[in-house]
Each structure stands twice: as C-alpha cells, then as structure tokens.
Design a protein with these regions (language model features):
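A generic structural signal for short, non-catalytic loop/turn and secondary-structure boundary residues
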Residues: 1, 33, 49, 78-81, ...
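Short beta-strand elements
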Residues: 36-43, 84-90
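C-terminal structural segments of small proteins and small subunits
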Residues: 59-95
Length: 95
C-alpha cells in the first residue's frame, strides 16, 4: 500500500471575510475530492481569511500512480479561480 500526502498553502486575495474563504475552499475541496478521488481537508489557517492550508491524501498500490495523482492535483489548483498556490509539499510513504 502506498500513501501520498500533499500540503498546499494558498492565498485568497479576493476573499474579504471568513465566509468568502469558506465558500471558495468548499468549492475547491469538493471539486478535488470528486475529480481525483482523494481525501481533502483544511489543515491550518482556519481563522485567517486570506490564507489557507489544505491537506490531501491519496492511497494506491502503485507509487508512480499516487505521485501522478498528487502532481495533477497541484496543477489543477494552480488554475483554480479565486486561489493562488504559494507552496506545495508532497510525500510518498510505503513499499
């Protein structure tokens, strides 16, 4: 079993309240989860309205497949409206 994790730091420049931030992040998280069959959660900066950190987890039997999924997630987030990707950190665990 291979587990891949991804930490993504975002800036939401057009967000003017926590309500705006939550709306954008909910849309992003739902889209990522459905499109890539991954688990997604907001992991830090919950009370700051212009920055966010989301964590992503993917599980599979092939390390290159898991890495490919995480890379595709990063590329998708880069072009998602309303957010700016600041940093991403990817780790792969398992055989």
């Amino acid at each position: 079993m291979i587990v891949g994790t991804l930490k993504i730091r975002l800036v939401l420049r057009e967000s003017h309240s926590l309500k705006d931030k939550r709306r954008v992040l909910k849309s992003l998280k739902d889209t990522l989860s459905n499109k890539f069959n991954i688990s997604v959660a907001e992991t830090d900066e919950q009370d700051v309205w212009q920055t966010a950190e989301i964590g992503v987890a993917a599980v599979g039997s092939d390390g290159s497949f898991v890495q490919s999924v995480l890379t595709n997630v990063v590329n998708y987030v880069r072009f998602f409206g309303g957010v700016e990707l600041v940093n991403s950190e990817q780790e792969i665990y398992g055989d």
